[in-house]
């Protein structure tokens, strides 16, 4: 999937719509109020990635050479026996490790959204 597709499907996983042209996330909060989050990009923003993981109840496991992300709850299309992972070089810089974590969170969220 392209980065745009990852963002579109990740937004869908949290019942929102991602506007590719403007980089805005549109949706409704739990009280039914409409909102628009300017510059939503969990591929680049730690806070956006964290909120995405929190909304979907994703677990993040860091190891010396990889990052594993799986779901606490069952989601259609996600095999609970097969967590998603991405390789991180041993002793890699924090900025690279953060990039790998964000990208893996978005990949899992996008897969959830794609299966909805």
Language-model features, listed with the residues they occupy:
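Glycine-rich anion-binding surface patch
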Residues: 1-116
